[in-house]
């Protein structure tokens, strides 16, 4: 990669640090995480971490357009990202380095509308790279500029508001236990964001039973919220096909085709799930 004109080396504290590729720089620049250490991709020490951040700060944002982490030819997630990248939106920030992008995001004259205007030109790797150069205070300051407001039965994302998810899980998915836990949480003012159950078992019959339970609870007390049973997307699709009261679709996703395969999903399946959710009627406007 260095032969492509990308600088992946820096001298720091009397030592020259050189990285094999951009992925190695990104990994080493991350804050310390035990999972990265176990995976063998973390920086060896704090100095190497700082050296990776030096390299990242001077890296032009354009680099990420030509050096994707997973090959375009073999990965459908990469193809989705590259094919949807908006060159016109990117033009505003195209001359910047990753470090310059951080300064641009933090600048007083960069407001939420300005960030939204370039958002379609920001690849996930660009966002990940700049976050590695930001302190927590920086991330908070940048995020505070942006408003993402969503509405279903309740509204989330308004300035100065806080919403809470109620999670009435039960070790055996016992409906009575879940109902009792849900009522307890509601009495404490939780659940305005959503009532979401992580089921102990992922099966269609159990999922449908829990969906009806939450729907009856919400309807009986006229609670302005939405519910979700966090099952695999195929289970949720099947529940919709059987007329279950699905409000929200859930699915864990990853950043590569191979990782998504580990979750048992593809982009086609995700699109199918979204279409199923959007097809719901009868007062439901489910979100995928």
Language-model features, listed with the residues they occupy:
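Alpha-helix-loop-beta-strand connector modules within alpha/beta enzyme cores
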Residues: 138-144, 150-151, 158-164, 205-232, ...
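Catalytic alpha/beta core domains of metabolic enzymes, predominantly
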Residues: 241-288
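Glycine-rich, proline-tolerant flexible connector loops at the mouths of alpha/beta enzymes
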Residues: 118-119, 123, 130-138, 193-214
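Active-site mouth loops of central-metabolism enzymes
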Residues: 81, 160-178
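Active-site beta-loop-alpha junctions enriched in small/polar residues
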Residues: 167-171, 198-200, 228-235, 252-256
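Catalytic cores of alpha/beta
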Residues: 177-179, 233-246
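Long, compositionally biased, glycine/small-hydrophobic-enriched stretches that function as flexible linkers
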Residues: 1-147
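Conserved, mostly hydrophobic/aromatic
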Residues: 185
